[in-house]
Amino acid sequence: MSAYNYPLISVITVSYNAVLTIEQTILSVINQTYLNIEYIIIDGGSTDGTVNVIKKYADKIAYWVSESDKGIYDAMNKGIAYSHGEYCNFINAGDKFCSSSILKQVMDFNHVADIIVGQDLHVNEHNKIVSRSVLPRRYNLLHFYITTIPHQSCFIRASLLKKYYYDTSLKIVSDWKFYLQSIVLGGHSVAAYNNVIVICNPRGASSDNNRIKEEREKVLKDLLQAYIVNDYQCLSCLGEEFIENALFLFNNHWIRFLVKKGLAIMVKIVRIFK
């Protein structure tokens, strides 16, 4: 299959004062063997030399801009608006694709699904592996009760992103809201590529657990019926460890029915004694 029979992928990097890390990200994109790539960089008006690094590779970048924005989701929306690809991928400044052939491997695996999800590998400042994401059997509301999808290892149809865009009133969980809208409520197809796509460097974003909880509850109230929001709150009371264990068990076919029944019973018990 020739390069132009593959879908155009718009790879979007959002950056701000990332002079020490953005070059490895740029190189991991422009050195891909997958040729049908449109690379976009949205910089938030960096003052530390990031722009000079971007200019160094300007001939390899389809579009870039450096200007102030209203936060990361505003910058991501700008990237979506400028994109022409069939799929979009967001790779953060400092992160990098795991190999020069990974985009071709992903598109060889599937370029039909609305959303293609892979694994991300997190390393520390010493390049030691800290964690590796695990893909669930299915992406349903139970999954999103406690976690999300790593957007840096995700390829999303641009038409979906342009339908919803990211909610800039949210500071942490706007991508989580998008997945609820597109997957849980919209029923759009997801293909799981059970291999590492991106290596992620440590960062401090999305670490405010109280803010995450507040924003998630706001999203649920906006999108879902009241009784489902109540279920979410009850499940939160049960504790994260219980739900994580339930999700692990849920991936085992022979006890999935029992897990479903057990969760329903536990929610009812919590409601009675709440």
For each predicted feature, which ranges?
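A conserved acidic beta->alpha catalytic loop
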Residues: 35, 43-52, 92
